């Protein structure tokens, strides 16, 4: 099956698995997905992840995080899509739930959170928002 938006596919897999209280979820590997997962790990939205296998069957196992029985990731929203890219400059970077969530951007300085982008004074493609 061909996936037209691999990033959205990963985010939805993580969201669905956490809503069903699964301990892990597997997603096909890509460098961009790994960078996004690094941010989610650093910000405390997932417990950990590991890259498993060799190309072409390489995948990432994501270990989900819960507070009691409540998933840490409440929702995710894919903003920039393959058919409709969404770019923001440094002044337009949104604050997710008044700072309780994060926005992930792809900038000229790499993939980073909204806070890091504001600190560096760069804008870019708004990939997704997580809360």
Swiss-Prot record:
Keyword Secreted among record annotations: no
Statement: the UniProt record of this protein carries the keyword rRNA-binding: yes
Entry keyword set: Ribonucleoprotein, Ribosomal protein, RNA-binding, rRNA-binding
GO biological process, one term: translation
GO CC term (a single one): ribosome
PANTHER family: 40S RIBOSOMAL PROTEIN S15A (PTHR11758)
Record family assignment: Belongs to the universal ribosomal protein uS8 family.
UniProt subunit comment: Part of the 30S ribosomal subunit. Contacts proteins S5 and S12.
Stored HAMAP family: Ribosomal_uS8_B (MF_01302_B)
Function: One of the primary rRNA binding proteins, it binds directly to 16S rRNA central domain where it helps coordinate assembly of the platform of the 30S subunit.
Entry protein name: Small ribosomal subunit protein uS8
Organism, scientific name: Dictyoglomus thermophilum (strain ATCC 35947 / DSM 3960 / H-6-12)
